[in-house]
A protein has these predicted regions:
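Short aromatic-glycine motifs in intrinsically disordered, low-complexity regions
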Residues: 67-70, 123-128, 140
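Short beta-strand edge/turn micro-motifs at domain boundaries
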Residues: 96-98, 127-164
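Short, low-complexity N-terminal intrinsically disordered segments enriched in polar/charged residues
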Residues: 1-41
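Short solvent-exposed loop/turn micro-motifs enriched in small/polar/acidic residues
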Residues: 18, 74-77, 130-132
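Binding-site signature for planar aromatic cofactors or substrates
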Residues: 11-20, 94, 102, 107, ...
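Short structured motifs
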Residues: 20, 76-80, 122
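A solvent-exposed, acidic/Ser-Thr-rich amphipathic alpha-helical stretch
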Residues: 32-109
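Short, surface-exposed loop/helix-turn segments at secondary-structure junctions
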Residues: 111-124, 129
Length: 165
């Protein structure tokens, strides 16, 4: 590999890693415009293994918007990222990539004692619902940079703790 190819590969991997981080932040912040902007127009998302839906990125963003209202405090931790960039003939990076990444998602279910938006949540923000599993992301290079073509959630476990008074 030449230095130019190695540099391009590193830059692609960083951009793809940033795309995955952007996914977590958009969901945690409830920023559905940013969520939609992560995808190509025909992007697809599958949350069925976690009891959700499968559909277009727009349809899933609408579903997540409704579902995440139950969890005023949430934080996706996406780790163990394995990024694979397809190669062209000659070893140059191609225009498609896949990422397998584990996630841990502690959340706090909404309740009568939750702080109002913008206020300090204090002790009521302790996570009482946690789920974990693996994301499989597919991405392709677009005019505006790397964008997601597909996200599949493979939930492995979940835990619901009793609410504390």
């Amino acid at each position: 590999m030449t230095q130019r190819v190695e540099h391009t590969t590193v830059m692609d991997r960083l951009a793809i890693d940033d795309l995955v981080t952007g996914y977590a932040i958009a969901v945690d912040d409830g920023d559905w415009a940013a969520y939609r902007a992560l995808f190509v127009p025909d992007g697809h998302v599958d949350y069925r293994s976690a009891g959700g839906i499968a559909g277009s990125a727009d349809a899933v963003a609408d579903w997540l918007d409704e579902m995440m209202r139950r969890f005023p405090v949430r934080q996706h931790l996406i780790v163990n990222r394995r990024i694979g960039v397809a190669l062209r003939d000659g070893g140059a990076p191609g225009d498609t990539a896949t990422v397998q990444a584990d996630y841990l998602n502690p959340m706090h279910l909404a309740g009568p004692h939750d702080a109002p938006p913008g206020a300090s949540a204090g002790a009521s923000a302790a996570p009482n619902y946690t789920c974990a599993g693996r994301y499989v992301f597919a991405a392709r290079r677009a005019a505006e940079g790397w964008r997601l073509t597909e996200v599949v959630v493979h939930e492995k476990w979940r835990q619901l703790l009793p609410a504390h008074a």
